[in-house]
Amino acid sequence: MTSHRSQSKATVQVRPPPSFIEGVQDKSWTPTPENWLYGSWYMTHTSQQYYWERTKNFVIQYAPVMNGVWPCTNQELVSLTPLSQPERIYTAFGIDSPVAGLDDAWLCQCTGHLSHISDHVAFLAWGADSKNVDWVVLYSTPLPGATVGLPAQVAIMSRERFGPDNSMVEAIKEAFCAAGDSDLTKLVDNLRPLLQEDLESGRPTCEYHVVQNVDSLTRF
């Protein structure tokens, strides 16, 4: 989806990670348009070392759980391939519930075999590159006191498999570094490209074994 033209390089707008517990909205934040997030997003850059060292073809598919008053509860289907198992696709399925008082922020609760894993997730920036391809910066962090899961990360995702152009990526990084949040700057400084290949096969669908996380990405 490339229909929404947004911030140019000179006007990349960012926000620090919101306070998920207090639910205090950053007044300068411009929410994404209704239904804008739905569909497939290719993760092209991530600060999560586990991902850029060990995986490729990381995709997140968002869809509404049901039609209703916006913001809706969404389903999230993650798929990726381990570098060590290039013929395999692993998945993780979860339900994203909006965080009260915040735009573009959710509590992601995994299901089935991964029901013990939850994260807070939020969009920290969004827009379109010079080719009018939509991109978004995703932030995810474990819940306070969590003993399982991966540490906090930022990631750039795009509607196109190979991501926003290099000038857009640099503009995004510069905007976050200029925001003055030291913890966020450390994550942004650790952003690395994530391998995306031009695949002909389709993505996984939400069949029963996928929803139950029977063959989840935590098992490789």
Where are these regions (language model features)?
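A beta-rich soluble binding module of mature secreted/lumenal proteins
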Residues: M1-F220
